[in-house]
C-alpha cells in the first residue's frame, strides 16, 4: 500500500499540519486502518479509494479513533491525488461517510475545498473554561467543537491549557481565537484531547466554525486565518451562507510502501 506524508496548510516543509495519506485499490479492515493511524501517530491519517473518474471515497482516522471530518487531511489527500493520480484534473469529489460530498479544486492560490459550516450555538462561559485556559473567554460557542473567543492575540499564542480540564470541556476539538494582527483577520489554536491529541497544528474543520464567527463580527466574507501552533499555518477562508471554502497549500515530505499484509 502506498503512503504519502504531507505537510498541509503551508508551502514549507516542517510547517503546517502533518497528514499521512494512504491511497488504496480497495478498503482494508477497520482494525488495520486504526493500527496504521496509531503507528503513524499524526493527528490524522487519511485513507482513500477511487470509485469512479475523479471521485474518491475518503475516511480519516486519528490515533484515538475514526473522525467524521478532517480539513487538513482532506487537503493532503487532494494534494497527493492531484500530484500523482489526477494530474490532468482540476477537480476531485470526495465521498465521505457522515458529511456527504466534498469538492476540491486546484487553482493559482492552491487547493480550495468546500465544506459545510458549523453552527454557532452560544453557550455559557464557565469556571472550568477559565480554569482550563488560565483566562476567561468573552464568548463561547458549541457545535461538534467548542470555540472560545478571547480579546488578546498574545494570550492565544502563549496559552498552555491544562489537558485534563480540556477533556472535561467536551467537543471533538476545542478552538481558541482572537481578532488577528499582522495582516490576519484572526489568530487561533486548536486542541483535541478527546482524540488523544493535545494540540492540533492546523485545523481546517474547526475553521468551519472560526471563519463564520469572524465573518459575522468583521462583516466580511473572506477571512485570512493564522493558526498559531509551533508549526503554524495559513488558511484562506470564504464564508458562503451554510458553506465555508478553505484554500491552502501543501508540500510532500515523503512517500513509501507500507509493509502490511492486506487480505
Predicted regions and their residues:
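Active-site proximal loop and beta-alpha junction motif in alpha/beta enzyme cores
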Residues: 1-70, 75-263
Amino acid at each position: 500500500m502506498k503512503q504519502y506524508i504531507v505537510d498541509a496548510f503551508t508551502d514549507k516543509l516542517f510547517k503546517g499540519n502533518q497528514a499521512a495519506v494512504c491511497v488504496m485499490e480497495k478498503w482494508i479492515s477497520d482494525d488495520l486502518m486504526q493500527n496504521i493511524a496509531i503507528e503513524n501517530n499524526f493527528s490524522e491519517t487519511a485513507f482513500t479509494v477511487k470509485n469512479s473518474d475523479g471521485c474518491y471515497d475518503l475516511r480519516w482516522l486519528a490515533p484515538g479513533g475514526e473522525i467524521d471530518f478532517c480539513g487538513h487531511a482532506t487537503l493532503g489527500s487532494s494534494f497527493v491525488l492531484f500530484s500523482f493520480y489526477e494530474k490532468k484534473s482540476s477537480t476531485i469529489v470526495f465521498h465521505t461517510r457522515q458529511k456527504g460530498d466534498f469538492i476540491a479544486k486546484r487553482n493559482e492560490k492552491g487547493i480550495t475545498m468546500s465544506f459545510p459550516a458549523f453552527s454557532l450555538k452560544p453557550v455559557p462561559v464557565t469556571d472550568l473554561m477559565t480554569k482550563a485556559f488560565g483566562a476567561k473567554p468573552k464568548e463561547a460557542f458549541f457545535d461538534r467543537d467548542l470555540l472560545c473567543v478571547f480579546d488578546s492575540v498574545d494570550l492565544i499564542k502563549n496559552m498552555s491549557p491544562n489537558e485534563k480540564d480540556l477533556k472535561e470541556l467536551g467537543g471533538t476539538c476545542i478552538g481558541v481565537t482572537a481578532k488577528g494582527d499582522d495582516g490576519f483577520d484572526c489568530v487561533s489554536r486548536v486542541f483535541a484531547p478527546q482524540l488523544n491529541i493535545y494540540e492540533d497544528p492546523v485545523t481546517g474543520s474547526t475553521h468551519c466554525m472560526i471563519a463564520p464567527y469572524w465573518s459575522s463580527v468583521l462583516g466580511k466574507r473572506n477571512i485570512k486565518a493564522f493558526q498559531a501552533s509551533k508549526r503554524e499555518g495559513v488558511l484562506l477562508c470564504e464564508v458562503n451562507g451554510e458553506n465555508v471554502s478553505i484554500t491552502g497549500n501543501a508540500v510532500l515530505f515523503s512517500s513509501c510502501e507500507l509493509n502490511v499484509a492486506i487480505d
